[in-house]
Amino acid sequence: MKIKFDQNMDPRGATILKQAGHEVLTVKEQNLIGAEDEVIAKVCQDESRCLVTLDLDFANTILYPPQNYFGLVVLRHPKPTAKSLLELVRQFSAALQSLDPTQKLWIVEPGRIRVRE
């Protein structure tokens, strides 16, 4: 799967996904740090990439209707630490083996993934 890692994501998470066979680009690698959410969303559409982020704005289905994207994935943890967020990336990676986030919003939380279409 083609994935875009937002600027608020630990780059070690991108490595986890790359090792699982996914094609991952980061916002930093594309010199998009500081870009507005709308710009990031448009780049993801243009590149057919699923966005992985901590930014709750992307969970707003009115602003970002999931059917218009190749996947919007928001990681949520009640006590976010680098370690706990990397665990959520691993959980997301495992889910990709059997599920497809295309045209969906996934909220990845410890032990579950909420899906909105």
Regions found by a protein language model. Give the residues of each.
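Short secondary-structure capping/turn micro-motifs that flank functional sites
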Residues: 33-34, 54, 59-61
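Mid-chain, well-packed structural core segment of small domains
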Residues: 59-92
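Short secondary-structure boundary segments
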Residues: 7, 54-56, 77
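N-terminal first-folded block
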Residues: 2-50
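Structural signal for conserved beta-strand scaffold positions within catalytic alpha/beta enzyme cores
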Residues: 26, 53, 74-76, 107, ...
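Charged phosphate-binding loop/patch that engages nucleotide di/tri-phosphates or the phosphate backbone
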Residues: 94-117
